Amino acid sequence: MILASKGPFSGNRHRTLVSRLIDELLKKRVTILTADYEGYLKPHRQGRHEPDVVGETSSGLLVIGEAKLCEDLATLHTYEQFSDFSNRAMEDGPLAGRAIPFHIITPMECSPALHSILKDLNLENRDNIHIWLSG
């Protein structure tokens, strides 16, 4: 089922998730290059959509991050994002061809829906997809 609307407070809750994802990536020593968050430049399009966070590891490997609220999971937009972001690979340099890690953060109560969507998209066993649960 594809949903279409967001609640009135979804912007604040989404920003909180983006902040938590940035914090987790920083703990993993990922340098945040761009983020849809105050103090950062907005990320550029990766495929059809802009992710919430783009970072880089010390080896130069890009990292893509996306925050999703429960009500945003079952949308065409999210399906396209997950497909696009999970299938990105490094284009040049010594890491050319290597899959770009894709980090997804969502509230803990959304975990079953997230796993169901990843299964629907045949992404549930991808090594480059990392799930963070908040709350």
Report the location of each language-model feature.
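Conserved catalytic cores of phosphodiester-cleaving nucleases, focusing on short active-site segments
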Residues: 53-79, 85-86
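Well-ordered, non-membrane alpha-helical segments in soluble/globular domains
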Residues: 15-19, 76-89, 112-114
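Arginine/glycine-rich "motif VI" loop of SF2 helicases in the C-terminal RecA-like domain
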Residues: 87-99, 123
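Short connector loops at helix/strand junctions that flank enzyme active sites
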Residues: 48-50, 60-64, 97-99
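Short acidic, S/G/P-rich loop/turn micro-motifs used as interaction or catalytic elements
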Residues: 40, 69-74, 108-112
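Short, flexible/disordered intra-domain loops and linkers
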Residues: 4-10, 73-80
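Active-site metal-binding core of divalent-cation-utilizing nuclease and nuclease-like domains
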Residues: 2-11, 27-59
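Domain-level recognition of nuclease-like catalytic cores that cleave nucleotide substrates
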Residues: 100-135
